[in-house]
Regions:
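A glycine-rich helix N-cap at a beta->alpha junction
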Residues: 74-93, 177
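Glycine- and other small-residue-rich loops at beta-strand/loop junctions that grip anionic moieties
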Residues: 6, 36, 126-127, 152-153, ...
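RNA substrate-binding interface of SAM-dependent RNA methyltransferases
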Residues: 4, 42, 49, 80-82, ...
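Boundary-proximal intrinsically disordered activation/regulatory segments immediately upstream
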Residues: 1-70, 155-156
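Short, aromatic/basic amphipathic alpha-helical patches
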Residues: 66-77, 230-231
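Structured adenosyl-cofactor binding patch, chiefly the S-adenosyl-L-methionine
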Residues: 102, 140-144, 153-172, 229-268
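Active-site/ligand-binding-proximal alpha/beta "capping" segment
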Residues: 195-247
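Short glycine-rich anion-binding loops that position phosphate/pyrophosphate groups of nucleotides
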Residues: 41, 62-63, 87, 107, ...
Length: 268
């Protein structure tokens, strides 16, 4: 692998790490593919394990023979741009987590049909734009037995750098794609839908009918505006998490973890 010393803020080849927005990264190279940034040896290792293709590395000089050595070795002949901590921080605008970044090619996403095939518990993320929440939801999904994730187009991109980091690489462990259509379309794949919302006719999340469903799609939304009426109307169940001390709602990432645990498949 070529080790390339960065000598200036305009060094050729490093624009992918410091001059492109998330939207520009998504469109780089090939429309529909693009590039994303993974950071830290552990997260990059998970991406490589999942088959993601590395394109370039940026690494603090001191980590080349240290914590990033095994990542550099696994990435083969991709260029490794290096420099001191201060220069790389100035270039990227943030401190590199564990001293290393990896630009990776985006995969072709599976279709909804492929996502729903042979799955029993999926989550639909509706309009969640906060990167931290997206990352936390994916981490809980991976840990608590969710088979796949669907996201509405107005949700945050799961391959956003911060979302990937917060998820600790869990975005590479759970299949995901964008939702085409509405949650009602999931019925044709054999799913019943459970929308997490506070309504007068909602049922408690510990209702036995929910755990008994062989195929269930759990619909999560940011706690700000809640689920749109149309989404609630299309859902087979409207579900609430019972709360104490007058608290009326949880952050969407916390609510997702509760829902995934309560509604998990237990006969594995």
């Amino acid at each position: 692998m070529p080790i390339i010393e960065i000598s200036s803020l305009t060094h050729p080849g490093v624009d992918v790490f410091c001059m492109l927005t998330e939207a520009q990264l998504r469109q780089r190279m090939e429309p529909g593919k693009g590039v994303f940034i993974a950071e830290s040896p552990n997260v990059i290792s998970r991406a490589l394990d999942a088959g993601y293709e590395p394109l370039a590395l940026m690494c603090e000089r001191k980590h080349i023979s240290g914590s990033a050595a095994h990542i550099i070795k696994r990435c083969g002949d991709v260029p490794v741009y290096t420099g001191d901590r201060e220069l790389l921080t100035t270039l990227t605008g943030y401190v590199l987590t564990r001293g290393v970044l990896c630009a990776m090619r985006r995969p072709v996403l599976p279709s909804m049909e492929e996502i729903c095939r042979d799955t029993r518990r999926i989550v639909v993320i509706d309009g969640v734009v906060d990167t931290t929440n997206i990352g936390a939801i994916f981490r809980s999904a991976a840990a608590l037995g969710i088979d796949a994730v669907l996201l509405t187009r107005n949700s945050c991109d799961p391959l956003n750098r911060r979302a990937v980091r917060v998820s600790m690489g869990s975005v590479f462990l759970v299949p995901w794609t964008w939702l085409n259509g509405t949650i009602g379309d999931l019925n044709k794949f054999g799913f019943r839908t459970a929308a997490m919302a506070l309504t007068d006719d909602s049922i408690s999340i510990d209702h036995p009918i929910l755990a008994a469903e062989p195929r269930l799609a759990i619909v999560m939304v940011t706690e700000g505006d809640g689920l749109p009426y149309k989404t609630i109307a299309e859902a087979d169940y409207v579900v609430r998490i019972p709360m104490a001390h007058g608290v009326d709602s949880l952050n969407v990432a916390a609510a997702a973890a509760v829902a995934f645990w309560q509604l998990r498949i237990t006969d594995l």
